[in-house]
Every structure is written in structure tokens, then in C-alpha cells.
């Protein structure tokens, strides 16, 4: 098993999620292959992997790093496969979960109603379908870091303005905006942000089976604790979502509605997902055990 890491060499003390995951992966028995942290050009891939030997048999690998463009992911995947090293998520599988509009048709009623638009002119019809207020995000990422007003529209005009801002930010949208039903999630206010936090949890899964999970938001309160029955119900929704997708390694964010039911907020590729409150040691030990089967 191999971890393809963009963490610095040697690993810094402390560090970000990439460093923490790399450290945990090595401790769990993964061999480390390094890629530059600032991998910007396709021409850099082959030189970066030049000293990596061809394996006698196909060896599974997990990439831990910064969000790559589609072309970069394909280039790294091809260079590794030439050495008989196979990323757990091939390029098509990576895109299925990383660009939410690809996953949405398979998730169906597990998640909020969603309409995908690629122009501002399509927004009014999308809003008519999902209703107001509506939540808008890019195909990749939202603007939650900029606050509630950067994501939630109460009028068609506001929705059009949010869509225009997302379409300008290709690193968030890749040219597509998701206009989503604003679900009645359980929400709590925190002093540090005007974006209300919910009872939302991130789950990492391999082949539909949970590896590890943790509270999503970077704030802790009594609302974050899960009872055994709640955890089982939440994980069941995450597992069902993962089983509907062809992608092997998946992150599923699950939130609780005001009526107590659980829904999928979004999905992603754990190779480039934040850990939230997931213990990296637990995650990578479980992943090592599953890949060794």
C-alpha cells in the first residue's frame, strides 16, 4: 500500500491535515511516495515520480494533497499506473464524487433537490424548481467561508448574483453552479461565524463500509455528541449514499433535519477532503486493514 503525499519532506511537527494524514498513513504501514506541494504543471509529474520503481504486482495507492485540476489528476494517475501503482479512485471515480453534479442523480432523495446551471440566465428557472430561500454552491465547493449571505439567496435577484460570483470562481464551480433546496437542518449559532452550524458529520468509507467519522464543523458544543442510535442512523445514510456510487473511497457529509431524520449534504474524495474531527490514526489504520484484505 502506498500513500502519495504532498506533505513536506521531512514532515513538520504539527502541520495541517495533509501532514497529519501522511504521518498516520506511514504509521499504519503505507509506503510514502512524495509529490511537490505546489504541483502546478503537467510537465512536473513525470520528473517528480522518476525514481519510483515499477511494482511487480499492482499496488493500491491513496493520494493525500491539495485539490488538483482534472488534467493533473489524470496525469498523476497515468504516471502511477505506468509503474503498476493504482490510485484507489481512478479519474472517473474521483470526478464522480468531487464534482457534486455528477453524484447527484444517483443520490436522489437522500439529498436536497438540486438544479445545475451553467449560466446566470438559467437561475430563475432553477429557483422556481427548488424554491426560496435557496442554497448555491459550485460544482466543487461552496463559499461558506464567506458567510451565510455568500451561499443563501432569498430572491431570484440574489440567486443570480450568487451564481455569477460562483461562475467567476472556476476553482469553486468549474463552470457549473448547483442551486439547491435549503433544507430545514438543525442549526446552532456560534460567536465565531454568521454561518449557523448544524449536526453534521463527515464519514469516510471504502466500498460502502465506514472507516471513520467525526463532527464536521470546527466548533464544538453539546449538540455535536452522538448517541449510539443516532450514530447508527447517520452511518446508515452515509453507507447507502456510498453504495449508490461507483467510487471506492468516498467522503459523505451527513446532516440532521429538524425532525430528526438524516440527509446527505454532499460527497467528496477523501484524498482531498479535510479531516474535520476525524482521528487520522483511526482512519488510516482502518483503511490499511481494508486494503489488505
For the regions a protein language model found, what residue spans apply to each?
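C-terminal active-site "lid" helix and adjoining low-complexity regulatory extension at the edge
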Residues: 244-247, 256-293
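A structural preference for short, hydrophobic beta-strand core positions in alpha/beta folds
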Residues: 32-35, 89, 116, 254
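ATP-binding N-terminal substructure of ATP-dependent carboxylate-amine bond-forming enzymes
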Residues: 1-86
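Short, surface-exposed charged micro-motifs
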Residues: 200-202, 253
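Short acidic-glycine loop/turn motifs at beta-strand connectors
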Residues: 205-209, 257-260
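Short beta->alpha transition motifs characteristic of CBS
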Residues: 209, 213-218, 267-274
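Catalytic phosphate/metal-binding cores of nucleic-acid and nucleotide-processing enzymes, i.e., regions
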Residues: 114, 131, 143, 173-174, ...
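Active-site nucleotide/adenylate-binding loops and adjacent lid/helix of ATP-dependent enzymes
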Residues: 1-11, 15, 52-56, 76-192, ...
